Regions:
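Active-site-adjacent core segments of small-molecule enzymes
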Residues: 60-368
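Low-complexity intrinsically disordered segments
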Residues: 2, 9-11, 36
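Basic polycationic patches enriched in arginine
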Residues: 21-24, 40
Length: 368
């Protein structure tokens, strides 16, 4: 029987990886779920920890990025050679061609109208490389590396969250601390329920995640705000959207009947048959819109500009090996695109870098 976590959470959210702790059974190489809905198979959290440790574990003043990676490795285990976040993924290649409107908004080289080679990575938003693709309330992602003329790169990191559960790295750590302090046996209201009470967009963000029928049929959002600067010096705050040609979601019941790797099997078959096409779009902020808090969505009526077409044509051979060398960093920008006052890109880049450094050491933790 599932233990209610929060009055606004339905059964799908209760089964979300955030609320299911995994342990290893002696003599069994597989991880099993314990706690709420313990009969479910391996689940993973997007970022987080369910281990029963206190916030005092961070009394050594470790950097925030280190705390986040430590928690991620503790909850999902260390999987050498895999990323600590979005562990299960596949690399694809293709091109991007910008629209004329993109160049009016930003002087960035990738918007000059030429064909830009790209390497992209589709992924499940969990830290376990064997997580079933149909796991409910789990974000899916696409990270894109644009290979610019002259040899430089710039990155975009997007996922299926329409907005993030929290707005700062500190709030994310506090969310993890609340999860840590809220085992199934904790009295109610537990720390997680209290956190949701003061951060109402957190359960809304997690509960709004759909299940796609294909990576090709999902919409991905750049939850953070960036600043476009055009040749005249005009500045415009934007949030990215990577939009499919069609958007198709399925129910949890339908997903449960599919193979555990159905998203990855499907994308390989689709690209082999014909290119997979997305439209890169920018949601334009109104001068009155805040840019600092990724947990606060902008109004739905904001202008959306089509920046260009992303055409994916090939799965990278030996993708698992190839992706180990790649980092997709939200702060890896190019002239014409700048950071806003949103703190999360810097926090994410720092965490990915910590994790990458650990993976680079033989026998150590995985990374992004």
């Amino acid at each position: 029987m599932c233990i209610p976590i929060h009055p606004n959470l339905d059964s799908t959210m209760i089964n979300h990886p955030l609320f299911v702790r995994r342990e290893r059974v002696p003599g069994n190489k597989k991880e099993v779920a314990v706690g709420s809905c313990a009969t479910r198979l391996v689940k993973s959290l997007m970022w987080g920890s369910l281990l029963l440790v206190s916030a005092a574990a961070f009394a050594d003043n470790a950097p925030l990025s280190t705390q986040i990676v430590d928690l991620a490795n503790k909850v999902d285990g260390v999987h050498p050679g895999y990323r600590a976040f979005h562990a299960k993924g596949v690399l694809v290649e293709g091109t991007f061609k910008a629209s004329p409107e993109a160049a009016r908004l930003s002087s960035a080289t990738l918007f000059n109208g030429g064909s830009i080679r790209v390497t992209a990575r589709f992924s499940d938003g969990a830290g376990v490389p064997t997580v079933p693709d149909g796991t409910p309330a789990m974000p899916r992602g696409i990270a894109i590396k644009y290979h610019l003329p002259g040899g430089a790169d710039t990155d975009m990191v997007t996922n299926s969250f329409k907005f993030f559960p929290v707005g700062t790295g500190e709030d994310f750590r506090d969310l993890l601390t609340a999860i840590v302090a809220s085992p199934p046996t904790a009295p109610h209201p537990n720390k997680l329920e209290q956190f949701f009470g003061t951060h109402p967009n957190a359960p809304k963000a997690i509960g709004s995640l759909p299940i796609p029928d294909s990576f090709a049929d999902e919409e991905y959002h750049g939850i953070d705000a960036f600043i476009f600067v055009n040749k005249s010096g005009q500045r415009q705050a934007v949030r990215y959207v990577v939009a499919p040609e069609k958007l198709v979601h399925i129910t949890a019941e339908e997903a449960a009947k599919l193979p555990p790797d159905y998203l990855f099997d499907d994308i390989a078959k689709r690209i082999a048959q014909k290119p997979v096409v997305f439209h890169l779009k920018a949601v334009l902020a109104d001068p009155s819109d805040q840019t600092k808090d990724a947990s606060q969505p902008w109004p739905d009526d904001r202008k959306v500009v089509d920046l260009g077409v992303l055409t994916l044509t090939k799965v990278v051979p030996n993708s698992k090996e190839a992706e180990k060398k790649l980092l997709f960093l939200p702060t890896n920008l190019t002239a014409g695109i700048e950071l806003s006052d949103d703190p999360l890109p810097t926090v994410r880049t720092a965490a990915y870098s910590v994790s990458f450094g650990r993976r680079s050491q033989p026998g150590s933790a995985s990374s992004n």
